[in-house]
Amino acid sequence: MDLFEYQARDMFEAHGVPVLAGIVAHTPEEAKAAAEKIGGVTVVKAQVKVGGRGKAGGVKVAKTAEEALEHSTNILGMDIKGHTVNKVMIAQGADIAEEFYFSVLLDRANRNYLAMCSVEGGMEIEQLAVERPEALAKIAIDPAVGIDQAKADEIVAAAGFAEELRGKVADVILKLWDVFKKEDATLVEVNPLVRTGAGEIVALDGKVSLDENADFRHVHHAHLEDKDAADPLEAKAKAQDLNYVKLDGEVGIIGNGAGLVMSTLDVVAYAGENHGNVKPANFLDIGGGASAEVMANGLDVILGDSQVKSVFVNVFGGITACDAVAKGIVGALAELGSSANKPLVVRLDGNNVEEGRRILTEANHPLVTLAATMDEGADKAAELANAAK
C-alpha cells in the first residue's frame, strides 16, 4: 500500500524523523485555515500517489493565506497522470541550503534490502541513476542486521557527504530505518532530504510503501487506506478476505492456488483469441477453502463486475477435495439465487474428482457446464463470454 505524502510525513514524525509542519486540507477554506495556522510562507502540495506533481502545476508556493486559498482552489480537482487531486497538504516553507536523497527498499532480485543515497537530491532519481550512476551510492543491507550506526556511517561516507554533516545525516538515516523496519515497509524514500540554512537536516518530501502481507501486525494501518481510490470490487473482496485483483476482461476466474490461477489467466487469454479476443476479468484465488460461503463470496464479487459475461471455475482438489468444492458451488448458486445470472464453466481435477463431478451433474443447474480439461473449460468460457458480448 502506497501512502500519500502527508501520511508519510506523519509516520516520519512519529518515529522521530525531523519534518516541517504540514496539514492536510480537503477544501480551499481548510487550506487557508491551515496556512494561517502554520504562518509565514507555505507550500500547497497536491496529494496524489504519482510523481511529476510540480511539473503538472500541483505544487505552488504561497506567501499568504489568501494565496494558499487561490492555489488550492486551482489544484483541487486537478488531474495529474490520471489521478484526481482530492486533497492538498499545506506545508511549512523551507529555507533550503542543500538537497540530498535517501531511500531504503526491498531488493527482490537479490533477496535483500538496499539503501541508496546521494548528495544530489531534488531531481528524478531514475534520471540521476542513468546519467551519473557514480553519484548514487548503493549499499546492500543484511536483513538480519539492518542499518546500525556503523552501516549508517558507511552509507553517508559512500554518498560523499561533507564531514561536518555526516553525523546528522546518519542520525536521520537510522530513524528512517526505524520507520522501514517497525512499519513493515517495502520502500521508504526521502527526496529531497535537505540541509536548512540553520544547518538542520529535514525530510522535506517522503514516499512510503507498506507490505500489506504484514497488516495483521499493524491494525493502525487500516486508516491509511485510500477508500476513495480503491476499486469497489477489490475493496469488497478484501473485506471478505478474498485474494482478488480486477482486470479488464470478460471471463471471470476462480481457482485455488496462485500458480493455478495465473495459468488459468494465460489459457483463457489464449482461448479468447479465437472468440472475439475476450480476456480474463480478474484474478481470484480462494486458496484451500472452497466452502459454500467462500464460493458465494467469490461469485458475488465477480458477478458484481458488469464486464463479466461468463465465469470459469478451475479447481484442483487437494486438501480440499473436489466433492467439497462441488458442494460449495451448488450451495453458492442457491445462496446467490437470481443474482447468479452468468454461465459458469467448471473444471475439477484431483482428489475425489468423480464424486465432485457427480454432485454437479445431479444438481443439473442450468448455468453450470462441466469441462474435462483446463483447455476445454477455458475455450468454453471464452465462447460463452463472446456470445454474450
Swiss-Prot record:
Record GO terms (molecular function): ATP binding; magnesium ion binding; succinate-CoA ligase (ADP-forming) activity; succinate-CoA ligase (GDP-forming) activity
GO BP terms in the entry: succinyl-CoA metabolic process; tricarboxylic acid cycle
Binding-site residues, substrate: N256, G318, I319, T320
The keyword DNA repair is assigned to this record: no
Pfam families reported in the protein's UniProt record: ATP-grasp_2, Ligase_CoA
Cofactor(s) required, per the database record: Mg(2+)
Substrates-to-products reaction catalysed: succinate + ATP + CoA = succinyl-CoA + ADP + phosphate; GTP + succinate + CoA = succinyl-CoA + GDP + phosphate
ATP-grasp domain location: 9-236
Keywords: ATP-binding, Ligase, Magnesium, Metal-binding, Nucleotide-binding, Tricarboxylic acid cycle
Metabolic or biological pathway, per its Swiss-Prot or TrEMBL entry: Carbohydrate metabolism; tricarboxylic acid cycle; succinate from succinyl-CoA (ligase route): step 1/1
Any single GO CC term annotated in Swiss-Prot or TrEMBL for this entry: succinate-CoA ligase complex
EC number: 6.2.1.5
Keyword set includes Membrane: no
Gene3D superfamilies the UniProt entry points to: ATP-grasp fold, A domain, ATP-grasp fold, B domain, Succinyl-CoA synthetase domains
UniProt: Mg(2+) binding residues: N191, D205
Chain positions recorded as ATP binding sites: K45, G52, R53, G54, A94, E99
Highest rank taxon of the organism: Bacteria
Self-association and partners: Heterotetramer of two alpha and two beta subunits.
Function (record text): Succinyl-CoA synthetase functions in the citric acid cycle (TCA), coupling the hydrolysis of succinyl-CoA to the synthesis of either ATP or GTP and thus represents the only step of substrate-level phosphorylation in the TCA. The beta subunit provides nucleotide specificity of the enzyme and binds the substrate succinate, while the binding sites for coenzyme A and phosphate are found in the alpha subunit.
Family per record: Belongs to the succinate/malate CoA ligase beta subunit family.
Name the record gives this protein: Succinate--CoA ligase [ADP-forming] subunit beta
Organism: Paenarthrobacter aurescens (strain TC1)
Lineage: Bacteria, Bacillati, Actinomycetota, Actinomycetes, Micrococcales
